[in-house]
């Protein structure tokens, strides 16, 4: 944890997406336009799309026509039903995440590769509330997205099964009862074998989500990669376990060692000294935005991967939307200028997910009442969709069987009693 961090790393193995590659192309004297000596990302994307199936799309069309009735006689496109029952039109339909099937019977969640879980809890906030509406806001704007990503060559509809199990029933103004609900819900989804994606909610949910994971790890360990501007390591805030406190309590559990907690993007004027003291004493691994910029994105990703996976069996990602510069994500409880650019955060996420055994992710601190034109909710949607794409590209999804780190029997005593 106390390993010095080089400020000038050697040329990374993975070239930065923002670094010019002059050796890979030359200019023609006639047009002065670059001619690439290797396929461009766009060229590769065109070929990847050719290789994707259309099976899922056709199934959606057939089901839409069966359940939603064939369109009126005047409709020339005969894939359009009378009642909207699929992706289109984007402005219509019931707002599950990306219009995924709603699974009312959560006992069947294990039949899917990925489960979206809403956690509408903001009783842990210490300033601006509203994150209880985060799941609604994210789901609503997610209808803007298609299941296909051009650059990645991934079509989620064709390559994985996605469901939305709705929201955990949280208790307003009672963190501890809400935490119990969250831990039970997360443990259920995790143990089923479905990959859990949580829509927060304030960051106080970080503790109960990790507790839910740890209940089904047996003697295995989980590393935590935490994107944030704030350390969130106080024992209490305002006399309770608030959104400034999740990692103090999560790393009290033997399954989630503090030395495997990596905190990316920390900095600014909202980092309480009590939390800094805990980071120092427990040896967490912090990189500021300046560290990341001076090291380079690849060196920062290498650092995060090495620390989070050292002696652990899987990695939990906790993505606080305020790690991104406040100009891009105004709809959050504690906006802090000077954060990561969206493309920087997304690149780090890409490297981390493609190179670690990820067991789940939460996206927290989206507060729609403070948002502008759904910017923040859309950023959260992008993080979630990119996560699923990288899991597909890296071969982690779809799962042929449950990962070996999932322990069938629950251990309800993973955390220390706290009053």
Located regions from the model:
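Low-complexity proline/serine/threonine-rich segments in eukaryotic and viral proteins
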Residues: 1-29
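Conserved alpha-helical scaffold segments that buttress catalytic/binding sites
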Residues: 31-419
């Amino acid at each position: 944890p106390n390993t010095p961090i080089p400020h000038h790393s050697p040329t990374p193995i993975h070239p930065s997406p923002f670094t010019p590659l002059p050796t890979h192309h030359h200019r023609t004297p006639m047009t002065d336009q670059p001619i690439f000596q290797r396929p461009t990302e766009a060229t590769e994307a065109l070929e990847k799309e050719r290789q994707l199936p259309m099976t899922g799309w056709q199934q959606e069309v057939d089901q839409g026509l069966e359940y939603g009735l064939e369109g009126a006689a005047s409709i020339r496109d005969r894939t359009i039903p009378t009642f909207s029952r699929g992706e289109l039109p984007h402005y219509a339909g019931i707002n599950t995440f990306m219009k995924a099937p709603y699974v009312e019977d959560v006992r069947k969640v294990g039949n899917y590769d990925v489960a979206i879980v809403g956690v509408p809890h903001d009783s842990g906030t210490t300033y601006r509330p509203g994150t209880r509406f985060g799941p609604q806001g994210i789901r609503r704007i997610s209808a803007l997205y298609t299941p296909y990503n051009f650059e990645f060559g991934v079509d989620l509809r064709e390559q994985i099964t996605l469901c939305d199990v709705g929201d955990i029933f949280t208790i307003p103004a009672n963190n501890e009862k809400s935490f119990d609900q969250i831990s039970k819900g997360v443990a259920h989804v995790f143990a089923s074998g479905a990959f859990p994606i949580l829509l927060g909610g304030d960051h106080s949910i970080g503790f109960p989500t990790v507790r839910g994971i740890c209940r089904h790890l047996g003697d295995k360990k989980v590393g935590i990669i935490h994107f944030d501007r704030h350390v969130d390591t106080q024992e209490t805030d305002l006399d309770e376990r608030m959104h400034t406190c999740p990692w103090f309590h999560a790393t009290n559990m033997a399954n989630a060692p503090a030395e495997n907690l990596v905190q990316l993007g920390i900095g600014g004027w909202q980092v309480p000294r009590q939390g800094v003291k805990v980071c120092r004493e427990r040896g967490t691994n912090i990189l500021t935005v300046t560290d990341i910029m001076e090291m380079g994105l690849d060196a920062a990703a290498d650092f995060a991967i090495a620390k989070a996976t050292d002696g652990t069996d899987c990695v939990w990602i906790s993505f606080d939307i305020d790690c991104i510069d406040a100009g891009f994500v105004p709809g959050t409880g504690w906006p802090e200028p000077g954060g990561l650019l969206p493309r920087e955060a997304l690149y780090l996420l890409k490297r981390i997910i493609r190179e670690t055994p990820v067991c789940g992710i939460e996206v927290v601190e989206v507060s729609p009442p403070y948002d502008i034109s759904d910017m923040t909710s859309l950023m959260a949607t992008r993080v979630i969709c990119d996560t699923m794409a990288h899991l597909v590209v890296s071969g982690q999804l779809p799962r042929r069987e449950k990962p070996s780190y999932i322990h069938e029997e629950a251990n309800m005593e993973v955390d220390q009693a706290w009053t």
